[in-house]
Regions:
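Hydrophobic alpha-helical transmembrane segments in multi-pass membrane proteins
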Residues: 21, 75-256, 318
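Short amphipathic alpha-helical coupling elements at transmembrane boundaries
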Residues: 50, 66, 81, 127, ...
């Protein structure tokens, strides 16, 4: 199809699709000939998605499926549009934050409970399997490659360098598929990470210098931590991705900064409580529904922010 604001041909080309054929019917020639491992993995993913749908109502179930499993198109079209306008579509995409939690948990368990080689294998395999489980989109692949490089460097007794890991991930991905360079998700993922690695520390140093002028180091440290966690991280990512948003989509969200500042602090509790409720629901649905009441208010809060800010007529500049 020819769309006014989206180059669908370029989108398909970035995924290795050169032509699209449509036939009048499909004839099934065989079954069970694919990868048993991947088939099992995707069945588990579908089972978890079904469990989320059983323990939570919509649209909260759709939001949790996006946050935990990276399942797209699980929300009504108008709510999807509100997420885009509010600059919060990224929370529905598995990214470096999810990968870092998985890698951190594996590192913690591996170092304390297992010997060197078993722990290293567990960490590397765990990150790779999780990346396959949620789907190898550009942000997931970028985050997984960086995590594998950081884990490998730590177990080799070498200091990891985030900017070097980012450059290495970019090299590996573009060497494997040069068309990634034209992918909006690839550009946004690397731009946001670059903002967090380069822009946020520079902004933080300037803020610390200003706060220290107040004469109270302890108070300055408290305000610095709060500002970094709530504002600077969001601001750095937004500034870094602004050129990509403008060139790719021809617009920028004015609501993105306040929306992210309001929503990002509750993402970790949502992931942890949501994962626990889903695991319990997988064992026994009524137990999962009880546990889901802990995460439902947080999901409802996120949706309220999206509906409020995403519904403003002045939320974007085109």
């Amino acid at each position: 199809p020819v769309l006014d604001e989206f180059d669908y041909r370029e989108y398909l080309a970035g995924r290795g699709v050169g032509s699209v054929l449509r036939g009048p019917r499909v004839v099934r020639l065989g079954a069970g000939e694919g990868s048993t491992f991947l088939r099992t993995l995707y069945r588990w993913r579908q089972a978890l998605r079904s469990t989320v749908a059983r323990i939570l109502p919509n649209p909260e179930a759709g939001l949790l499926s996006g946050i935990l499993l990276g399942v797209g198109h699980s929300l009504p079209a108008d709510l999807d549009e509100a997420f885009r306008v509010a600059g919060l579509s990224h929370i529905m995409v598995i990214s470096g934050y999810n990968i870092s939690l998985v890698a951190g948990a594996l590192l913690l368990v591996g170092r304390k409970r297992l010997n060197y080689w078993v722990a290293l294998g567990l960490c590397l395999a765990g990150v790779a399997v999780y990346a396959l489980f949620v789907g190898l989109s550009a942000p997931v692949l970028r985050a997984a490659l960086m995590a594998l490089l950081v884990i490998g460097s730590q177990y080799a007794g070498r200091r990891s360098h985030t900017l070097t890991s980012l450059a290495a991930a970019a090299f590996i991905m573009t060497a494997a598929n040069p068309l990634y360079l034209w992918s909006a998700s690839y550009q946004l993922s690397f731009a946001a990470t670059l903002g967090l690695v380069v822009v946020e520390p520079a902004m933080g140093r300037r803020l610390d210098a200003r706060l220290l002028q107040s004469g109270d180091p302890q108070r300055a440290a408290r305000w610095s931590i709060l500002a970094r966690d709530v504002l600077l991280v969001t601001l750095a990512a937004q500034l870094a991705t602004l050129p990509v948003m403008w060139t790719q989509f021809g617009e920028a969200s004015l609501a993105a900064l306040p929306a992210n500042a309001l929503v990002l602090p509750v993402q970790t509790p949502i992931m942890l409580l949501g994962a626990a409720a889903t695991a319990l629901g997988l064992l026994w649905a009524p137990l999962g529904r009880v546990a889901a009441w802990l995460v439902w208010p947080l999901l409802r809060y996120c949706l309220w922010v999206v509906e409020t800010l995403g519904g403003l007529s002045s939320a974007t500049v085109a």
